[in-house]
């Protein structure tokens, strides 16, 4: 029955200019423009998902739909793509933002870590009215961006921020980071050249076929196209952002956490190569009064591939002010 309900959930893919960059937004629910009167009543809250890297927004659709259903269709759930992680298809239009002036100014180094944070701020200012409360959900490096969005724009009406598998410190020292750092920082240009040679001349229909085969082998059902994952432009930007993560995300920003602690919930994995249990233990020690949880369900860092329903259930319980079932 749940799957039948989720099939009926309206999901749309839209493209906007944000900080001078074409940006994909996936919207779950009947609301398209929160500034305009529509056939449905204006929601009081918006659930806004900031993905990880290379967390292409299409991967988060099952999670968004599950969360939308668990919240009884009361609030829209939106997923923003990172700057440079999507290419607008030829059959799609780049739409005007409700508050266009917020998106007119280009962002310096928009594909880098700082630029990506400013990119999210520009979108929220242009698309979300001040009387709509925000429920921010960050995943992986999206948690780092979430914290810094809150720090830089204090007037944002953030009700809650849920930080899933938070990569907010010592990324290059983590088990995965020790491998990824030399690859992303020293061999990034080799990846650029390889992806350009392999995929630039490749027709879109062939890319779609390759992705369908790969997703089929991984038993992943995609509801929206994912050809961006084989676009050299997008791959290069994902690698560039990753290289900056390894270099810049080092010391945990305790000042931000202290300032917003009552609004924050952290969820760590037991076998997470990006934020190991030691990081969880340090957080619990330094912030004993915080809402900091360690997963007991075996949910992996890349939960969007197989555990969307389980993760959505936990987040829905948080939103409804119930302690999560570990």
From Swiss-Prot:
Q: What is the effect of changing residue 140 to A?
A: Reduces cholesterol efflux but no effect on cellular triglyceride accumulation
Q: Which reaction does it catalyse?
A: a cholesterol ester + H2O = cholesterol + a fatty acid + H(+)
Q: Where located?
A: Lipid droplet; Endoplasmic reticulum
PROSITE patterns tied to this protein: LIPASE_SER
Keywords of the record, alphabetical order, are: Endoplasmic reticulum, Hydrolase, Lipid droplet
Q: Reported effect of changing residue 301 to A?
A: No effect on cellular triglyceride accumulation
Q: Which residues form the active site?
A: 140 (nucleophile), 272 (charge relay system), 301 (charge relay system)
Could you state one GO biological process linked to this protein? cholesterol homeostasis
- Organs and tissues of expression: Expressed in liver, adrenal gland, prostate, spleen, kidney, brown and white adipose tissue, testis and to a lesser extent in brain (at protein level). Expressed in peritoneal macrophages and bone marrow-derived macrophages (at protein level). Highly expressed in macrophage and foam cell-rich areas in atherosclerotic lesions (at protein level). mRNA, but no protein, expressed in heart and muscle.
Q: What is this protein called?
A: Lipid droplet-associated hydrolase
Q: What's the source species for this entry?
A: Mus musculus
Q: What is the lineage of its organism?
A: Eukaryota, Metazoa, Chordata, Craniata, Vertebrata
Gene encoding the protein:
Ldah
């Amino acid at each position: 029955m749940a799957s039948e309900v989720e099939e009926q959930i309206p999901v749309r893919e839209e493209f906007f200019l944000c900080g001078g960059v074409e940006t994909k937004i996936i919207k779950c629910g009947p609301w398209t423009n929160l500034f305009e009167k529509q056939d449905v009543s204006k929601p009081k809250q918006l659930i806004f998902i900031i993905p990880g890297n290379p967390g292409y927004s299409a991967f988060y659709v099952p999670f968004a739909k599950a969360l939308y259903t668990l919240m009884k269709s009361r609030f829209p759930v939106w997923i923003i793509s990172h700057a440079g992680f999507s290419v607008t298809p030829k059959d799609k239009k780049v739409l005007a933002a409700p508050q266009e002036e917020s998106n007119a100014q280009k962002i310096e180094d928009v594909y880098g870590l700082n630029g990506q944070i400013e990119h999210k701020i520009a979108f929220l200012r242009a698309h979300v009215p001040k009387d709509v409360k925000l429920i921010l959900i960050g995943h992986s490096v999206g948690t780092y961006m979430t914290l810094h969005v809150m720090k830089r724009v204090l007037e944002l009406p953030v009700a809650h921020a849920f930080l899933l598998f938070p990569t907010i410190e010592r990324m290059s020292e983590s088990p995965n980071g020790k491998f990824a750092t030399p690859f992303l920082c020293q061999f990034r240009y080799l990846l650029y050249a390889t992806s350009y040679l392999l995929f630039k001349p490749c027709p879109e229909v062939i890319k779609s076929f390759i992705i369908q085969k790969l997703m089929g082998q991984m038993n992943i059902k995609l509801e929206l196209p994912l050809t961006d994952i084989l676009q050299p432009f997008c791959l290069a930007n994902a690698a560039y952002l990753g290289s900056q993560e390894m270099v810049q995300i080092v010391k945990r920003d305790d000042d931000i956490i202290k300032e917003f602690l009552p609004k924050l919930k952290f969820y760590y994995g037991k076998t997470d190569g990006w934020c190991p249990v030691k990081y969880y233990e340090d957080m619990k020690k330094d912030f004993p009064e915080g809402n900091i949880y360690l997963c007991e369900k075996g949910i992996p860092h890349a939960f969007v591939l197989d555990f969307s329903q389980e993760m959505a259930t936990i987040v829905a319980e948080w939103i409804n002010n119930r302690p999560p079932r570990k």
